[in-house]
């Protein structure tokens, strides 16, 4: 039987170029750049990449991203919906974001499936801090990393989402199927009902999602 540790949905976060500053001239090119800047305002939604989001998992639906922060040249994005369900670590051992299998999965399987070669050119490799959890400050956060795709920290989740309600994340139908898979192949009707009767955001079921900060156990991470 798999443990509940495996059930939490990941939420991918990407720091990417909002505009390309190379070869910018006047006239129409400058107007295009200004339009791109206006598009990437904090609180707005943009699309980048594709990922399965229907129950069948056979689709390639455009991924919607919420703009968390933008300086006119780069923008920090978080996926509007939880796109998949993965364990933080495939082994129950003391682990940090630096070494966890979820980080590897995000920057390999997810990254390569979600983005085209052209889209990858716009995604920056980010310096990702290793922060302690203020509630469990004895937990080792590991070392800082460089990632194309990563998760928010506890501090960042509190910074960009001011309330518990704002931090609730809706789940795609495909991700719900992954939740069921990780729970048990023989999941019963009562458990399915529990999932379906959970909180809702944007008319969709909301579920817990991973942060990269250490959690209450050395083998896992914090979650929302």
Question: What are the functions of these language-model segments?
Answer:
Residues 29-224:
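Collagenous Gly-X-Y triple-helix signature in extracellular proteins
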Residues 1-33:
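Gram-positive cell-envelope targeting signals
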């Amino acid at each position: 039987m798999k443990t509940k540790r495996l059930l939490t949905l990941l939420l991918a976060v990407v720091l990417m170029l909002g505009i390309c500053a190379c070869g910018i001239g006047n006239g129409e090119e400058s107007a295009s750049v200004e339009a791109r800047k206006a598009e990437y305002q904090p609180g707005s939604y943009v699309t980048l990449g594709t990922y399965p989001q229907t129950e069948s998992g056979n689709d390639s639906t455009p991924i919607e991203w919420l703009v968390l922060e933008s300086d006119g040249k780069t923008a920090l994005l978080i996926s509007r919906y939880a796109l998949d369900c993965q364990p933080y670590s495939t082994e129950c051992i003391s682990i940090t974001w630096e070494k966890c299998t979820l980080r590897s999965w995000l920057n390999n399987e997810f990254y390569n499936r979600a983005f085209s070669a052209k889209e990858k050119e716009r995604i920056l490799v980010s310096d990702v801090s290793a922060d302690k959890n203020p509630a469990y400050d004895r937990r080792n956060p590991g070392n800082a990393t460089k990632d194309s795709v990563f998760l928010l920290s506890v501090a960042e989740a509190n910074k960009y989402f001011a309330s518990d309600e704002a931090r609730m994340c809706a789940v795609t139908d495909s991700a719900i199927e992954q939740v069921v898979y990780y729970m048990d192949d023989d999941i019963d009707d009562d458990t399915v009902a529990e999932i379906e009767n959970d909180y809702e955001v944007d008319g969709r079921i909301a579920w817990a999602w991973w942060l990269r900060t250490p959690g209450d156990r050395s083998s896992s991470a914090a979650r929302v």
